[in-house]
Amino acid sequence: MKKIAVLTSGGDAPGMNAAVRAVVRYGVRQGLEVIGVRRGYSGLIDGDFVKLEYKDVAGITEKGGTILRTSRCEEFKTEEGRELAAKQIKKHGIEGLVVIGGEGSLTGAHLLYEEHKIPVVGIPATIDNDIGLTDMCIGVDTCLNTVMDAVQKLKDTASSHERAFIVEVMGRHSGYIALMAGLVTGAEAIIVPEIPVDYSQLADRILEERRRGKINSIIIVAEGAASAYTVARHLEYRIGYETRITILGHVQRGGSPTAFDRRLALSMGVEAVDALLDGEVDVMIALQGNKLVRVPIMEALSTKKTIDKKLYEIAYMLS
């Protein structure tokens, strides 16, 4: 193997740049030519390639986002689109591809291998932390720290005004961010997709806390469980006083990655290159315990990952 490529796809996650840097620098050290694909799978279809040298990735570890840019590509979801991408790969003599992204990106990588035998290795990078067989994905730790900081600031103002604040965080199918953020900030309630919410019970609990002298409440909601506005409407009807809504949105994706995310991304980038050189393809690099392992991409994607119900109960008891 003499030439490999790397791309970032889907939603960005803090630490993607660190992974790109590791793939490039370690690849060059192994005597490989490394090509960067701009704009994810859209760039793969269009042939938007750039050769990356050692110096091109200097100083990017600490930067959020991705220097390669990213996109969500509808064309790549079609067989015709993937065929165009495969032709570009072969035309440019690329012998292996590292894909950094979430569920959709990794599915695309698997299809490239299944349909066109393109050697691929995936690196999980998504703040939702919803990919199976890996304890953590790149970007999750940074996102949690961002949410924790924001909620702590909201608690300051909530206590000043004796209000209930409803904070909506990302998590379409997974309540991981909501659960962990709620646990570490002492939120009064956590609403996640995995557990049905009873608004009457929630309102009763907040009112009981009021009777005990607690003058403010923080409710953290995963976007996939309910909208913050829906929660606010139900609560205001039942508790009789106003709430305030904060939707953190895309601020959760940004920021300089934490030390944990940097280390994870750098290690996964190196392992991905090694996997290609070893001929172990159609695999994803996963963190299990304190070790990096290689697992089949589709096995990871077909393994349902859910929140820790016991941890949810602990968060409830400690709030």
Curated annotation (Swiss-Prot):
Allosterically activated by ADP and other diphosphonucleosides, and allosterically inhibited by phosphoenolpyruvate. One of its GO terms (cellular component) is 6-phosphofructokinase complex. It catalyses: beta-D-fructose 6-phosphate + ATP = beta-D-fructose 1,6-bisphosphate + ADP + H(+). The active site is at 128 (proton acceptor). InterPro entries: ATP_PFK (IPR022953), ATP_PFK_prok-type (IPR012003), PFKA_ATP_prok (IPR012828), Phosphofructokinase_CS (IPR015912), Phosphofructokinase_dom (IPR000023), PKF_sf (IPR035966). Substrate binds at residues 126-128, 163, 170-172, 223, 244, 250-253. GO terms for molecular function: 6-phosphofructokinase activity; AMP binding; ATP binding; fructose-6-phosphate binding; identical protein binding; metal ion binding; monosaccharide binding. Its EC number is 2.7.1.11. ATP binds at residues 11, 72-73, 102-105. Pfam families: PFK (PF00365). Pathway: Carbohydrate degradation; glycolysis; D-glyceraldehyde 3-phosphate and glycerone phosphate from D-glucose: step 3/4. ADP binds at residues 21-25, 155, 186-188, 212, 214-216. Its cofactor is Mg(2+). One of its GO terms (biological process) is canonical glycolysis. Mg(2+) binds at residue 103. It is found in: Cytoplasm. It comes from the Bacteria. Keywords: Allosteric enzyme, ATP-binding, Cytoplasm, Glycolysis, Kinase, Magnesium, Metal-binding, Nucleotide-binding, Transferase. Belongs to the phosphofructokinase type A (PFKA) family. ATP-dependent PFK group I subfamily. Prokaryotic clade 'B1' sub-subfamily. Catalyzes the phosphorylation of D-fructose 6-phosphate to fructose 1,6-bisphosphate by ATP, the first committing step of glycolysis. PANTHER family: ATP-DEPENDENT 6-PHOSPHOFRUCTOKINASE, PHOSPHOFRUCTOKINASE. Homotetramer. This is ATP-dependent 6-phosphofructokinase. The lineage of its organism: Bacteria, Thermotogati, Thermotogota, Thermotogae, Thermotogales. The gene is pfkA.
